Amino acid sequence: MNLDGRRESSNVEDRRGMSGGKKAGIGAGILGVLIAMAVAYFSGGDPLSAGMQAFQENGGLGSLTGTNTEVSEDQREFTEEEQELARFSTQILAGTEDVWKDIFEENEMEYEVPTMVLYTGATQTACGQGSAQMGPFYCSGDQKLYIDLSFFTEMKSKLGADGDFAYAYVIAHEVGHHVEYLTGILQDAHEKMAKMNQTDANKMSVRLELLADFYAGVWAHHDNKMFGSLEDGDIEEAINCAQVIGDDYLQKKARGYAVPESFNHGTSKQRMKWFKKGLETGDVSQGNTFECSDSEL
């Protein structure tokens, strides 16, 4: 990606160098369930059980439940690579602010910017305590997205998803959940899922996740239009990321077969489809994941 001269967002809390207390009620954000499965797979554990446990603890919505604990200082110097990745993340967040502010204004709405929290290990949130083990996540309780930047290393080593635009896709997806919150979609889905059995709740979760993928594509469309940010190979990076985090892809890799009723983020084909649809159209009205039949997803 070409980010030369791009501003960095000021809506960032840098909690790196601080560590939370005991772990409690971990929830999964985008890729979090899949990372849990990948870690289990590469360590000889049961990936499907690990993924389902993470999903059940979280509800598949990228929010956290748990008990807040003390936070302690653990200062250290960060490497040049770590600092560059932090800078990159704040530039991507700034890009989402610019794009979504304009889109909301076009629809006579006001975009309330989220805050991005950078942390290491564990941190407190309004939704409970978050853990780096479960990847990036969005907490609607405080309208913040939480990222331990070491997750991007995990993406590369465990899932084979690498490249700056792949990382940007992850951030834009979490911002997509914030857009869902601001428009009331997330709350409505939460309420409905609470009354559903697990299989139906999984299906609802898939629609939320695919919509966030679509919104990530919409952001990329307009960010490139505004700033000329995309370079050769960038789109392929994001498409590859969407493919390797598909529920079916990871389950087949881990177990040799997939269990469709357990899918809660969408198949590789679905995730690539909705990201590409957002990228190609840039039109938020095309994000009709809650209006499609299951076969149309």
Regions of interest found by a model, annotated:
Residues 1-77:
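Long amphipathic alpha-helical segments used for membrane anchoring, targeting, substrate engagement
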Residues 38, 100, 147, 165, ...:
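Active-site recognition of the HExxH zinc-binding catalytic motif
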Residues 50-128:
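A metal-dependent hydrolase signature that marks the N-terminal structural subdomain at the beginning
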Residues 83, 87-111, 200-203, 207-250:
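Short helix/loop segments within enzyme catalytic domains
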Residues 122-148:
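Catalytic zinc-binding patch centered on the HExxH motif and its immediate surroundings
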Residues 151-170, 200-206:
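Short pre-active-site segment immediately N-terminal to the catalytic Zn-binding motif
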Residues 175-190, 223-224:
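Catalytic Zn2+-binding segment of zinc metalloproteases
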Residues 243-297:
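Pan-zinc metallopeptidase signature
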